[in-house]
Amino acid sequence: MMDLTAYIDRIPSAGETSRGTEFTTGFGGKGANQAVMAAIAGAKTYFIGCIGNDLFGAGIMQNFQNRGVETKYLQESHRATGVAHIWVEANGENRIIIIPGANLEIDKSAAVSAIHEIPNLDIVIGQCEIKQEITLAAFKAAKARGATTILNPAPFENLSAELIAHSDWIIPNESEFAALGNIDANILLTEGDKGVRHLNSGKQVAALKVTAIDTTGAGDSFVGSFASKLNEGVDVAMRFGCIAAGLSVTRKGAQSSYPTYEEISTFS
């Protein structure tokens, strides 16, 4: 997806017109952000998704290649590439509206085939930016290969019991967790400037003490970096993810704000 971001001191009320301070375009989308962060963190990363045959789609393809994300399984659709309209307030908090576009055109059989083909598959991450049935099919195929599945339930929608059952990890933020209700799952709760908490074990890692200027994509940076270190243990992965997310909020944008591996390692 493409991020279309407006920075403004205060979000206007209904019917009010306000003057913003800055407008930017950048590469985004939750799955794309997570893939890019995982690649930055050193993981061999493949992206399964769909873009439009348009300028945004071409830019996304090139960005993945520049970032070291394998695009063999990136499909192309007649529908426009998905976009996210983002408003960022002076305190760094954001509001986001996504228009999925080509995201809704991912072919299920092609996605499952990709899961079967990817060599040395360890982890598959899914979100709710695509049809839930596609994510479920991919998770079933992943678990059949012995891979770990991670679900980031955003943008939030009610999850099927079957998808929950096929998710080894569910990583919601506070509002998504509240909407999930009482479910039987392995949950890692991201709590913004408070850090992250593994509800099942009680383990908690505090967030870095920083001044946030833009929280866009911070949760995605946590998910991608956490996944990249999960084979080293949950404690290591949680700490690494918190550092990546903490550094990202000190810069504007989503992927453009992501720290290098060396920057994260300085704190870990």
Predicted feature locations:
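Beta-strand->loop->alpha-helix junctions that form or flank phosphate-binding loops
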Residues: E22, I48-N53, K72-T81, A154, ...
